[in-house]
A protein has these predicted regions:
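Basic, flexible linker segments flanking DNA-binding modules
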Residues: 1-19, 117, 174-182
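RNase H-like two-metal-ion nuclease catalytic core shared by retroviral integrases
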Residues: 1-2, 88-90, 96-97, 112-133, ...
Length: 195
């Protein structure tokens, strides 16, 4: 991998204060699979907690990280701006010239955690922890990469659409995004005294 330089930390742990699509967090996690690992790359909106893009791979080559950014731009490009920051650690995937060029060509701004400081990307790390906890009973039963991917796909759909979170006004990430961009609280979720 041809390497570029690390980027400055533009986020400084101010994850939620800039609104939706302003700060996007990305990272890779290792997932056990039949005595080896498969790998998951995600891009998480720091404000809404939505998983905007993700890709899985059986290899740690940079391609699946690039695919994650490409999926982000394909599905959410219209809601991104030239001020949108994509924040990562200083791992080789994120300092590779391929990643740097893709992010710059996508008109996104790079930001990086300080070396070895997981707190600088804490919401992303926390997301992976919750995901693995909630999938703990399924992971041992995965017998193939396809089975792992199908399970992750189901969980991502559940997470974005149905997994309500206290910090998101008791809404799912997708409901919360709708709420903060339109001001409309989902009718089925209104407290009884409001109906």
């Amino acid at each position: 991998i041809r390497m570029g330089s690390a980027a400055a930390n533009l986020v400084n742990r101010e994850f939620e204060s800039h609104g939706p699509r302003a700060i996007l967090l990305t990272d890779i996690t290792y997932i056990p699979l039949c005595g080896r690992f498969c790998y998951l790359s995600t891009i998480l909106d720091a404000c809404t907690k939505q998983v905007l893009a993700y890709a899985m791979s059986e290899s740690l080559e940079v391609d699946f990280v690039l695919e994650t950014v490409q999926l982000l731009v394909k599905h959410h490009g219209i809601s991104l701006s030239k001020e949108t920051v994509i924040h990562s650690d200083q791992g080789t995937h994120y300092t590779s010239l391929k990643f740097i060029q893709l992010v710059e060509n996508s008109a996104l701004r790079r930001s990086m955690s300080r070396r070895g400081n997981c707190w600088d990307n804490a919401p992303q790390e926390s997301f992976f922890g919750h995901m693995k906890d909630e999938l703990a009973s399924e992971i041992p039963g995965w017998t193939s990469f396809e089975a792992a991917k199908a399970s992750i796909d189901r969980w991502m759909d559940y997470y974005n659409n149905d997994r309500c979170q206290w910090d998101l006004a008791k809404l799912s990430p997708n409901e919360y995004y709708h709420y903060i961009t339109t001001g409309e609280y989902p009718a089925g979720m209104l407290p009884l005294w409001v109906k």
